[in-house]
Amino acid sequence: MIRIKNVSAYYKTVQGTVKATEDVSFEIFDNEIIGIAGESGCGKTTLMKAIYGNVESPMYIAGGGIELEVDVHGEKKIITNQEIHRYWWEYITYVPQASMSVLNPVLRIKDQFLDSYLRPEVRALGKQALLQRMADYLRELELPPEVLNAYPHQLSGGMRQRVIVALATFVHPRFVLADEPTTALDVVVQRGILTMLVNLQKQLQNTFIIVSHDMGVHYQITHRMVIMYAGKVAEIARTDEIFDHPQHPYTEMLIDALPRVGDDQERAGISGRPPSLLDPPSGCRFASRCYLADERCTQVQPALVEVDPGHFVACLKREPSAQMRAQASVVRGVAHQ
């Protein structure tokens, strides 16, 4: 499990401090594929860097923290965000954007595998045994083992992306973060990458965190979704709930703007622009674009509230369902006994 607690991640720039994410809190469960969605600049990639512990200037963590809970020989171990970098590859790995810029252009793929796995228990296998394991693993992922002898420029974009996923999952980490894993790939290759990710997650029974601006990617493979807007979490729910019963006006407008098969009706985008994260508004950050907004929305920042079991929304216009109110009443009653 990953617990994200009130994380605020900022950037220092010559124009001022960019509040890329602010007071972000939610939990990522074991054995799930969770998606993080939202417009460009909403804080998705910044949040991924914070979770991975890859925080470098000008980015810094202004508040909050992150905990990874992992099982080590039958005992629970808590890893804080200050320690996460020590457990890269072993417990948590990251599949970044832009496959060509990730792979070293002057090294063969096999050498990049060998350089990545410096853990003593892995290296103890010996080079030839390790290369054989790599070849076997590539076959499992339906990749020809011959790619181990190739240079990155000799592989297609889709093949490079598959190699990066293989690199990230070779030692079966508990958490795999993938940032826009299908960007710049054609539809057929995208489908192959998504199928690969789903099959890997089922095989490894681990947790995948997928960042994508493409709602279709989330619809196809994620179990739950986190919708972000202007550095804040707007909504969290099961993926089917997000698509069938969106509660936040921003999510609703995102879903309404998606094209439908067999529907030639022109879809309207969301009018207006997100607020500047150099000086975000004090109230709801979506208020200036929201059809439900009133004066209170511009002044009061909404909290993330559970409106239905497992369905969280940050909107002053949405209230907990009768079921949630009844549960809260029972909890209060027990507390007063």
Which residues are covered by each model-predicted region?
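The feature captures the beta-strand-to-loop junction immediately N-terminal to the Walker
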Residues: A37-E39
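ABC ATPase NBD coupling module
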Residues: V72-T93, R119, E241-P246, S276-P281
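Conserved ABC ATPase "signature" region
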Residues: Q128-E146, I255
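A short, proline-enriched helix->beta-strand linker immediately N-terminal to the Walker B motif
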Residues: F170-R174
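P-loop NTP-binding/switch modules centered on Walker-like glycine-rich loops
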Residues: P181, L185-Q265
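Short catalytic/signature loops enriched in Gly
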Residues: I236-Q337
